[in-house]
A protein has these predicted regions:
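Cleavable N-terminal export/targeting peptides
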Residues: 1-48, 214
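Short glycine/proline- and aromatic-enriched beta-strand/turn motifs that initiate or cap beta-hairpins
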Residues: 34-82, 90, 142, 206-214
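Gram-negative (and chloroplast) outer-membrane scaffold detector with strong preference
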Residues: 39-41, 79-152, 159, 210-214
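Transmembrane beta-strands of outer-membrane beta-barrel proteins
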Residues: 49-55, 86, 90-92, 115-117, ...
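A mature extracytoplasmic/lumenal domain signature
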Residues: 57, 94-96, 183
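Outer-membrane beta-barrel proteins
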Residues: 64-67, 101-105, 147-151, 177, ...
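Predominantly the C-terminal beta-signal and adjacent terminal strand-loop region
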Residues: 99, 109-112, 171-214
Length: 214
């Protein structure tokens, strides 16, 4: 494969349909949470802190055409959540994946940054009152995706992104183990050459621990 000459790139346009779908999904999650808010809340004691912070490790797994541009990579993601209600949380995330541009000669190192905000709908806690519990959840959100070469003098590109997620949190006393998978749809523009903007897909899988106050 021949070396591509670096040229400045501009922000890729993102198909508005994907972003609209994420907003609609988040709205539906909030509406669903409102209908279950009157249910018995013993699975979610009011003494629980509304704020939750976890740093997770995982992997960014390109799918489809994205596999021709990115190498699967280790990923670190920081998440801050606020429990608006026992069944609904607002979650902000910042992720960093250490990938490579496999479309170029020598596959230069490429930092992939993902940042977003979304809504998370949580089901009743299974085995409530027991030492070991499990809480499944599903969510959706939108934000941005940036690509930046670590050692090449090339401008970073920035794109809109949307995701759907599913996962669960396993609890033992004050320890929580969170496992989550996210399916991302993002805008994409070739980083080192002129070309048409497109839409790409990848999956993030992450796991992390946190300690609760009670």
């Amino acid at each position: 494969m021949s070396q591509t000459t670096a040229t400045p790139t501009s922000t890729a346009r993102f198909a508005p349909a994907a972003l609209a779908q994420a907003v609609v999904a988040a709205t539906l999650l909030a509406a669903a949470a409102g209908t279950v808010g009157a249910q018995d809340s013993t699975a979610h004691p009011s003494v629980l802190s509304r704020f939750e912070f976890v740093v997770s490790s995982g992997a960014l797994l390109p799918t489809g055409d994205q596999r021709d541009a990115l190498k699967s990579a280790k990923m670190t993601i920081a998440q801050l959540s606020y429990a608006v209600r026992p069944y609904l949380a607002v979650t902000t995330s910042m992720g960093w994946a250490r990938s490579r541009d496999v479309a170029m000669t020598d596959a230069p190192k490429l930092d992939v940054f993902t940042y977003d905000v979304g809504a998370e709908l949580r089901a009743d806690r299974w085995l409530s009152g027991k030492a070991l519990t499990f809480t499944p959840f599903a969510g959706a959100g939108a934000g941005g995706r940036s690509y930046n070469y670590r050692s090449l003098d090339v401008d970073a590109t920035h794109n809109l992104a949307a995701y759907g997620s599913a996962g669960g949190e396993l609890g033992y006393r004050r320890i929580r183990f969170r496992l989550e998978a996210r399916d991302y749809v993002t805008g994409f523009k070739p980083m080192m050459a002129n070309g048409a903007s497109g839409r790409r897909n990848d999956v993030s899988v992450m796991a992390g621990f946190r300690i609760t106050a009670h």
